[in-house]
Amino acid sequence: MKINGTPYRTIWLAKDGRTVEIIDQTRLPHEFVVVPLASLEDAAKSIKDMWVRGAPLIGATAAYGMALATLADASDAGLERAYQVLHATRPTAINLKWALDEMIAALTPLPVPERSAAAYARAAEICDEDSAQNAALGEHGAAIIAAHHKAKNRTINILTHCNAGWLATVDWGTALAPIYKAFDAGIPLHVWVDETRPRNQGASLTARELNWHGVPHTVIADNTGGHLMQHGMVDLCIVGTDRTTRNGDVCNKIGTYLKALAAKDNNVPFYVGLPSPTIDWNVADGVKEIPIEERSDREQTHIFGKTEDGVVREVQVTPDGSPAVNYGFDVTPARLVTGLITERGVCEASPEGLKGLFPERA
């Protein structure tokens, strides 16, 4: 995607061929800062501290983290240590484990001296694959938006939650890829952007992306979506996912479940965009089996913003002594999902639907 006319991905190899560079997303929307990653520890910190986030981008960063680790120690023990360090950073996004498993499978059969070059090559492939998958699912999702426009012959209003745009992936995004593809094809649309507390990733990241791309959008408080749906102001919802089970349960940013309930009650289609590495074929019941990350309560009790003098500051929004809890994700049962938008097409959120698109997993 482009920022002020310059094409960017969210992660890329620096000119030295060894250092990896990322956009520090904790500094957005007010600052655009590129950060170099030169070691396994740098990569792990970038994931844990959410300089990068979004399931596909976490996976891509972990892949490059493995490559960086081989510069210091490409032995079997070194690979195992790197795997464990990176795997421990964030528990919910399945792309993290998927990417690490891909790297181990590619590297362990090779002689130690050949592993570093192979690691960088496989990490680059994972990034390219993610971009291609997201572009493809974007086309499938854009067809859904086009069908709504054809039926209603007016601007289509789409509600999204958190950030599942290109900042959450290597490029294009998941939930936002259909929006970008449809917008670029000339379909009139407007996006309702949930602010997505407590980290405000909708207000800070999704709005920033849509602004860069010129897509009409409006930021709303998290609890506004139901009201909009009741009054016919939402034509469809499209969200992303950090892990989707083989039965079609969808784990995504906290608050997604409530949007799906409101959509169901108001007959608003609720779609989920995901590349296939986000499917966890080993898990059936998302509510019971997916580990839900619990983050620092400080994210709930404090908030960042830009003051009138242009300084970005953190302020406390809760009383001293009030405890807070900060679950990062929730699970939307498959019965509330209209369809899953993947790189192979759109399917029902069910074992049969997923196996129809991915028969090799049957």
UniProtKB/Swiss-Prot annotation:
Presence of keyword Isomerase: yes
Pathway where this protein functions: Amino-acid biosynthesis; L-methionine biosynthesis via salvage pathway; L-methionine from S-methyl-5-thio-alpha-D-ribose 1-phosphate: step 1/6
Annotated active site: 242 (proton donor)
Site residues by UniProt (Transition state stabilizer): 162
Keywords tagged on the record: Amino-acid biosynthesis, Isomerase, Methionine biosynthesis
EC number: 5.3.1.23
Coiled coil (UniProt feature): none
A Pfam match: IF-2B
Catalytic activity: 5-(methylsulfanyl)-alpha-D-ribose 1-phosphate = 5-(methylsulfanyl)-D-ribulose 1-phosphate
Biological-process GO terms, alphabetical: L-methionine salvage from methylthioadenosine
Binding site for substrate: 53-55, 90, 201, 252-253
Principal EC category: isomerase
Molecular function GO terms recorded: S-methyl-5-thioribose-1-phosphate isomerase activity
HAMAP family, A to Z: Salvage_MtnA
Family designation: Belongs to the eIF-2B alpha/beta/delta subunits family. MtnA subfamily.
Function per UniProt: Catalyzes the interconversion of methylthioribose-1-phosphate (MTR-1-P) into methylthioribulose-1-phosphate (MTRu-1-P).
Protein's UniProt name: Methylthioribose-1-phosphate isomerase
Species annotation: Paramagnetospirillum magneticum (strain ATCC 700264 / AMB-1)
